[in-house]
């Protein structure tokens, strides 16, 4: 049995959200994601992995190509492999419990709101070109 207290494991940074990997199991990992008010994730996907979020406390908005949904305590969101998504935190600190499983856990981003100097990596450019060509 593995036990974690998300509040005790939490780490916050005013300049960016923190994703602290708590452990790994065969085929995946599990994380506490810590968000300060107003922080926004990159608009990204995990080409080969499913990503699952559970809102422990706080909340915000999750966006995909299909629209947006409120993320509130108790909300459970599943992103299948390659689904583009962006999380924007609300007005209070938020703890999200995240599980990633399946293939490789890397992400590919298309944009990063609030970071004017951010640029896609060559791997990200190539990935989205290949997806558009399919």
Regions found by a protein language model. Give the residues of each.
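Short strand-connecting beta-turns/loops that link adjacent beta-strands
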Residues: 26-27, 48, 92-93
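Short strand-coil-strand connectors
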Residues: 26, 63-67, 90
């Amino acid at each position: 049995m593995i036990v974690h207290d998300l509040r005790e494991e939490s780490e916050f940074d005013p300049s960016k959200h923190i994703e602290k990997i708590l452990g790994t199991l065969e085929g995946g990992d599990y994380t506490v994601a810590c968000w300060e008010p107003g922080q926004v994730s990159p608009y990204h996907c995990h080409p080969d992995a499913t990503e699952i979020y559970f809102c422990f406390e706080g909340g915000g908005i999750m966006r995909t190509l299909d629209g947006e949904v409120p993320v509130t305590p108790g909300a459970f969101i599943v992103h299948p492999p390659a689904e583009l998504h962006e999380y924007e935190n609300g007005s209070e600190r938020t703890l999200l419990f995240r599980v990633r499983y399946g293939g490789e856990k890397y992400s590919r981003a298309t944009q990063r709101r609030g970071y004017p100097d951010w640029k896609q990596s060559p791997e990200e450019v190539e990935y989205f070109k290949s997806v558009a060509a399919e």
